[in-house]
Amino acid sequence: MAIIHPKVRGFICTTTHPKGCELNVRDQIEATRKLGVREDGPKKVLVIGASSGYGLAARITAAFGFKADTLGVFFEKPGTETKAGTAGWYNSAAFDKFAKAEGLYSKSINGDAFSDEARAKVIELIKNEMGGKVDLVIYSLASPVRKLPQTGEVIRSALKPIGEPYKSTAIDTNKDTIIEASIEPATEQEIADTVTVMGGQDWQLWIDALAGANVLAEGARTVAFSYIGSDITWPIYWHGALGQAKQDLDETALRLDQKLADEVKGGANVAVLKSVVTQASSAIPVMPLYLSMVFKIMQEKGIHEGTQNQLDRMYRDRMYRADGAPADVDEKGRLRLDDWELRDDVQTACKALWPQVTTENLFELTDYAGYKKQFLNLFGFERADVNYDEDVATDVKFDCIEL
């Protein structure tokens, strides 16, 4: 038991609130349920990177929008008697509790999703507990490091531009001030390493392993999540080291799509999602300012979406359409869920607003207050229905295998 308040260091909140996290998950489940439960669609789903952000939302839509059995893989820190674990641990515990209450199969693996050990354990569980096959594999890993399974070598990714140093207006989120951020370009090695960590290699290893073990159902699909963003963030993102990794992901999708079409009459896509507040996005310089602006503009236009709305739209309007029609894809075969964010009217408004923002008018011109609240929400804080001065149980156990 502990009384827990937020402690923010840099772009990380070092504390989490178990009750707040549980209520966040409950709200996401309710949002999905409101759209109705479908009888068709995926029924046995593996989510790699299932504990927060888009991966968690994908697991929630599968379970509570389509009554699917789910297996989730993630790397989180459990809580102890005296110390809280990570938000993803409590998110997953809450998901497990609500899924089991519905009579759905829910199992989780806490370990390194980049490891062969994790793949072997997943295959064993699919064979022994999930009827032998899965029909959807969601790949949603966001990690700054990857340990290569063959050699044990640890590779790190770099959030850097390519070629030129990147200079831009940004928010110092610790002081709530507007600053000039400057980031030196990535070296060739850093670019290559970023592709190794965040590109399609591990996704390919997963699908190869699952296909090799014959645990992919007829018609099985796989989706990996990506972000392209607007040209405002391109120097640091799409045209930076991370963009190279995401282009590698695109190329991997084309290979996997062919493979799955040939082997199980299935398919693979990259899904390009909109920018949202996640632990991953808050680490990207310029993102907090861009998010604060684009949220305000999209809210004014009535087209703002959170993580759960995006995934509900991906499943219901793209992958598993009620009319059975194939999903709309772009010229690279990608599912585009960033279509509303990238509308001309939204981006033009962003570009007009960008040079006007100062420390003095930051809260007035943008939804930076909303950004800050959503950031703390990720860790279970800033909820009106939680008393943060009360003791809360931190040692939460659930149906999770520790690797």
Swiss-Prot record:
<dbReference type="Pfam" id="PF12242">
    <property type="entry name" value="Eno-Rase_NADH_b"/>
</dbReference>
<dbReference type="GO" id="GO:0050343">
    <property type="term" value="F:trans-2-enoyl-CoA reductase (NADH) activity"/>
</dbReference>
<feature type="binding site">
    <location>
        <begin position="49"/>
        <end position="54"/>
    </location>
    <ligand>
        <name>NAD(+)</name>
    </ligand>
</feature>
<dbReference type="GO" id="GO:0051287">
    <property type="term" value="F:NAD binding"/>
</dbReference>
<keyword id="KW-0276">Fatty acid metabolism</keyword>
<feature type="binding site">
    <location>
        <begin position="141"/>
        <end position="142"/>
    </location>
    <ligand>
        <name>NAD(+)</name>
    </ligand>
</feature>
<keyword id="KW-0275">Fatty acid biosynthesis</keyword>
<dbReference type="InterPro" id="IPR024910">
    <property type="entry name" value="Enoyl-CoA_Rdtase_cat_dom"/>
</dbReference>
<comment type="pathway">
    <text>Lipid metabolism; fatty acid biosynthesis.</text>
</comment>
<feature type="binding site">
    <location>
        <begin position="112"/>
        <end position="113"/>
    </location>
    <ligand>
        <name>NAD(+)</name>
    </ligand>
</feature>
<feature type="active site" description="Proton donor">
    <location>
        <position position="237"/>
    </location>
</feature>
<dbReference type="Pfam" id="PF12241">
    <property type="entry name" value="Enoyl_reductase"/>
</dbReference>
<feature type="binding site">
    <location>
        <begin position="75"/>
        <end position="76"/>
    </location>
    <ligand>
        <name>NAD(+)</name>
    </ligand>
</feature>
<keyword id="KW-0444">Lipid biosynthesis</keyword>
<feature type="binding site">
    <location>
        <position position="227"/>
    </location>
    <ligand>
        <name>substrate</name>
    </ligand>
</feature>
<comment type="subunit">
    <text>Monomer.</text>
</comment>
<dbReference type="GO" id="GO:0004318">
    <property type="term" value="F:enoyl-[acyl-carrier-protein] reductase (NADH) activity"/>
</dbReference>
<protein>
    <recommendedName>
        <fullName>Enoyl-[acyl-carrier-protein] reductase [NADH]</fullName>
        <ecNumber>1.3.1.9</ecNumber>
    </recommendedName>
</protein>
<keyword id="KW-0520">NAD</keyword>
<dbReference type="InterPro" id="IPR024906">
    <property type="entry name" value="Eno_Rdtase_FAD-bd_dom"/>
</dbReference>
<keyword id="KW-0560">Oxidoreductase</keyword>
<dbReference type="Pfam" id="PF07055">
    <property type="entry name" value="Eno-Rase_FAD_bd"/>
</dbReference>
<keyword id="KW-0443">Lipid metabolism</keyword>
<feature type="binding site">
    <location>
        <begin position="276"/>
        <end position="278"/>
    </location>
    <ligand>
        <name>NAD(+)</name>
    </ligand>
</feature>
<dbReference type="InterPro" id="IPR010758">
    <property type="entry name" value="Trans-2-enoyl-CoA_reductase"/>
</dbReference>
<feature type="site" description="Plays an important role in discriminating NADH against NADPH">
    <location>
        <position position="76"/>
    </location>
</feature>
<feature type="binding site">
    <location>
        <position position="246"/>
    </location>
    <ligand>
        <name>NAD(+)</name>
    </ligand>
</feature>
<comment type="function">
    <text>Involved in the final reduction of the elongation cycle of fatty acid synthesis (FAS II). Catalyzes the reduction of a carbon-carbon double bond in an enoyl moiety that is covalently linked to an acyl carrier protein (ACP).</text>
</comment>
<dbReference type="InterPro" id="IPR050048">
    <property type="entry name" value="FabV-like_NADH_b"/>
</dbReference>
<dbReference type="GO" id="GO:0006633">
    <property type="term" value="P:fatty acid biosynthetic process"/>
</dbReference>
<comment type="similarity">
    <text>Belongs to the TER reductase family.</text>
</comment>
